[in-house]
């Protein structure tokens, strides 16, 4: 595979696009992609897998030939269990080599449905039903994880399953530990199949189904959203995923000497594509850095040792990971192998980029993507000007525009350069709509443009700037406040590790800005000090937070992105508790996400006389909130 020319500006992207994607000899499926890589790079290492995320342990090494053989065996095992091409195999697994076998073998046999193990059991069951799942693959009972307990509690609710298959991490342990653990645990639950035993009996050189996979066949479902109710399922075709791998390879110029560290979960498109299919497409090596990835403190503490030992050339993370790595000394470590680090999922504060690069000498490249676009959409050019705070230039073959909509969400026109509007996507990696048809209202603009719901602008040079998420905007008396400007200012305080700004309800203004702060380990700063800092550094007077609340740890999603819905619920709770306790001291407030109402406040109220109860209801009526009163 010829090396890609370094992308400096938009003209280089346009030069690549002079060769249509259809003329780039793309594989017809992810299975054919892995087959080609096995033919070209058979004995090269595809995966180096760690069980503990430690630099001291010896990895399990898997060649491209072995990877393709295990993927083929997995596809055949699923076929023997009765899985058809239109049916799904769901997985609830940490980052293990078998997870890759299930993903790519599942796509060869049917459709893979990736499920976040941290979801509530009810949401997991809904995703299994919605995806037409017939086989479920999860973790065998194992110390330190409750995955099996979650699945065991759901078995009776899922009679449509043909089989439940378990991956046993004990099989990866040395013989004495393996046998001791299995003896202590006893036999697997009745009716449950062992993954490694199941695939061992299947051929590794052909698909027994004889299936001819077409580029437009659905390969996978990835869930997205779901702060209330069931997450949305985004189908990806084989063409979507192969095109994404090709585009990422062109953009990053992955080659056989690259080593990509994977710390993000394999139920998320970033882990699967950036540190999975894209490097596999080009014969690179993936370091699977432990089952829990970045959630494992050992991986964070050993991160720079791992970079040095494995000669890691790039990795992908989110801002919270970079903030954590800043606390780990890298002095004396040979980091010369690193070409760049990618940051996505949330805007990375400019000050955090500056601190990280000053400490490590490493170039941080911000990008942007989303599940509905298979993964990546834009990236700062690796060979050109990197504009801190920008999510860079669109990736090759990915179309991006900003649309101006009216108050009802109707398309008015395309935005002028630097004019803020809704960011819209089109191209070979964009999905065709959510599996649940009722989720597809108002997501398309014009001729096949997907409305991301993100607000942004594109400057004269093609650089894209996010200005906020439409639902993240703080609306103070009709004035839109971008939370990012507050967060950027707070990150400049030396004690701040993470900052997140949201709106708190206000009877007069609708919302007022507030901020949550997680301090750096060992650092100290009072809320008063941080408020004073904000008043001096937040550039817009109306955006200066009215309150700053210190918290021990920022709520995050499974991939480490700050989970603002939890902060909004907490802000509502704080306001209602403060206000209602002026009427009665022992009122308790609980605010929850509700599928019908969005946010619902439950107030547990002692016996009140008629006057105080009327005063409480008048107070609550001043907020645009749904609430319930409960007598205690």
Residue ranges of predicted features:
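Conserved AMP-binding/adenylate-forming
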Residues: 289, 340-344, 348-367, 371-464, ...
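Conserved AMP-binding/adenylation subdomain of ANL enzymes
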Residues: 107, 242-259, 269-313, 328
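Conserved AMP-binding A3 loop
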Residues: 61-65, 219-243
């Amino acid at each position: 595979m010829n090396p890609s020319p370094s992308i400096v500006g938009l003209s280089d992207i346009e030069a690549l696009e002079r060769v249509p994607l259809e003329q780039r000899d793309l594989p017809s499926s992810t299975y054919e992609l892995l087959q080609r890589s096995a033919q070209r790079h058979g004995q090269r290492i595809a995966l180096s897998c760690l069980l503990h995320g430690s630099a001291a342990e010896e990895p399990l090494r898997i060649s491209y030939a072995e990877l393709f053989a295990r993927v083929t065996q997995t596809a055949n095992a699923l076929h023997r269990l009765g899985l058809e091409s239109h049916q799904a195999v769901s997985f609830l697994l940490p980052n293990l080599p078998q997870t890759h076998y299930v993903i790519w073998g599942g796509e060869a046999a049917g459709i893979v449905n990736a499920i976040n193990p941290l979801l509530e059991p009810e949401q997991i069951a809904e995703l299994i039903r919605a995806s037409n799942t017939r086989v479920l693959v999860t973790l065998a009972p194992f110390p330190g994880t409750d995955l099996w307990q979650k699945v065991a509690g759901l078995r009776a609710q899922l009679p449509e399953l043909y089989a439940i298959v378990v991956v046993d991490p004990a099989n990866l342990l040395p013989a004495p530990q393996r046998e001791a653990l299995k003896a202590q645990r006893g036999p697997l639950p009745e009716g449950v199949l062992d993954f490694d035993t199941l695939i061992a009996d299947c051929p590794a050189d052909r698909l027994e189904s004889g299936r001819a996979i077409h580029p437009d066949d659905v390969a996978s479902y990835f869930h997205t959203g779901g702060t209330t109710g069931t997450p949305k399922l985004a189908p990806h075709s084989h063409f979507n995923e192969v095109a994404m791998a090709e585009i990422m390879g062109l953009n990053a110029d992955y080659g056989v000497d690259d080593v990509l560290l994977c710390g993000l979960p394999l139920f998320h498109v970033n882990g699967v594509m950036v540190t999975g299919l894209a490097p596999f497409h080009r014969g690179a090596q993936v370091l699977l850095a432990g089952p829990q990835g970045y959630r494992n403190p050992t991986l964070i503490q050993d991160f720079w040792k791992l970079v040095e030992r494995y000669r890691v050339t790039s990795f992908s993370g989110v801002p919270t990971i970079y903030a954590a790595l800043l606390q780990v000394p890298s002095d004396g470590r040979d980091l010369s192998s690193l070409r760049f680090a990618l940051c996505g999922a949330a805007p990375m504060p400019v000050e955090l980029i500056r601190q990280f690069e000053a400490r490590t000498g490493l170039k941080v490249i911000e990008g942007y993507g989303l599940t509905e676009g298979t993964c990546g959409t834009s990236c700062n050019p690796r060979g050109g000007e990197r504009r801190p705070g920008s999510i860079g230039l669109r990736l090759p073959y990915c179309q991006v525009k900003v649309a101006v909509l009216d108050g009802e969400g109707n398309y008015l026109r395309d935005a002028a350069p630097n004019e803020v509007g809704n960011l819209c996507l089109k191209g070979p990696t964009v999905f065709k709509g959510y599996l649940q048809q009722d989720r597809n209202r108002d997501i398309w603009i014009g001729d096949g443009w997907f409305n991301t719901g993100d607000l942004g602008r594109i400057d004269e040079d093609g650089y894209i700037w996010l200005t906020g998420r439409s639902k993240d905007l703080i609306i103070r008396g009709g004035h839109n406040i971008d939370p990012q400007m507050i967060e950027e200012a707070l990150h400049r305080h030396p004690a701040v590790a993470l900052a997140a700004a949201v709106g708190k309800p206000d009877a007069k203004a609708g919302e007022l800005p507030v901020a949550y702060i997680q301090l750096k380990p060992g650092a100290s700063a009072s809320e008063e000090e941080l408020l004073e800092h904000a008043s001096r550094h937040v550039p817009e007077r109306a955006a200066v937070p009215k309150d700053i609340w210190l918290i021990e740890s920022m709520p995050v999603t499974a991939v480490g992105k700050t989970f603002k819905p939890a902060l909004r619920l907490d802000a509502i709770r704080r306001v209602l508790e403060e206000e209602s306790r002026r009427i009665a001291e022992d009122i308790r407030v609980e605010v929850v996400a509700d599928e019908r109402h969005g946010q619902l406040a439950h107030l547990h109220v002692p016996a009140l006389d008629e006057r105080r109860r009327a005063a409480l209801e008048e107070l609550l009526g001043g907020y645009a909130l749904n609430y319930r009163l409960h007598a205690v």
